[in-house]
């Protein structure tokens, strides 16, 4: 018998943007199929006054409290207040900081939002995001050779969201749609530096996605053909043949999240893999 779905409050307190905390909280919550977290996110909490207001909200809607607050005084207030309310509190970063301190033999500086300083890495990500927007959906200016990776695939194989995710990691990504009957831009075959990767999925999966999303700029397909599984299978065969012919690695995204697809591409980049394969 299937257990009924239950809901719980998940409070996330951060002295920075909260992105790290949110990722950790969602990763943990995903392990519980019959429970759904009602997320309460409190970013940029850096004063006791701000924190006290947050704690009032937690008292009104008790639940698990996760926090990334480097100020030890504020961290102590969180732990003490949560203990008084009878709710669990966990410092997500503290075990990691303790391990670093033990290994490096030096204490952490404990600066809020230290990972978000405007350094070279930050500007590299901004540059990659701008590059991605200029090279999305088949836009291939003459500077395509600057790309780290070019993603190809038929419609609805998550090319654009994967490109955005990679750009957020500082990777310059372009993407090109493969449409049956429409020639692939010649500039793609001339590219020497970028890793070119093909994304595919099952016809069933793509049909399901296409039925729930508009066609967009697909001039050679009407609505019926766009969602028809037989037609999609032909598109996929064309895409696979093209990738195999040119030695481009193929990644099946049918059961992959955007993050997992991006991780597979990052692994290919890291290994310098340019031979045709399927994963």
Curated annotation (Swiss-Prot):
MF GO annotations: ADP binding; ATP binding; phosphotransferase activity, phosphate group as acceptor; protein serine/threonine kinase activity
Enzyme Commission (EC) number: 2.7.11.32, 2.7.4.27
Catalytic activity: N(tele)-phospho-L-histidyl/L-threonyl-[pyruvate, phosphate dikinase] + ADP = N(tele)-phospho-L-histidyl/O-phospho-L-threonyl-[pyruvate, phosphate dikinase] + AMP + H(+); N(tele)-phospho-L-histidyl/O-phospho-L-threonyl-[pyruvate, phosphate dikinase] + phosphate + H(+) = N(tele)-phospho-L-histidyl/L-threonyl-[pyruvate, phosphate dikinase] + diphosphate
InterPro entries, sorted: Kinase-pyrophosphorylase, PPDK_reg
Keywords from the UniProt entry: Kinase, Nucleotide-binding, Serine/threonine-protein kinase, Transferase
Enzyme class at the top of the EC tree: transferase
Signal peptide: none
Residues that coordinate or bind ADP: 153-160
Role description: Bifunctional serine/threonine kinase and phosphorylase involved in the regulation of the pyruvate, phosphate dikinase (PPDK) by catalyzing its phosphorylation/dephosphorylation.
Family of this protein: Belongs to the pyruvate, phosphate/water dikinase regulatory protein family. PDRP subfamily.
Protein name, as recorded: Putative pyruvate, phosphate dikinase regulatory protein
Organism listed in the record: Brucella melitensis biotype 2 (strain ATCC 23457)
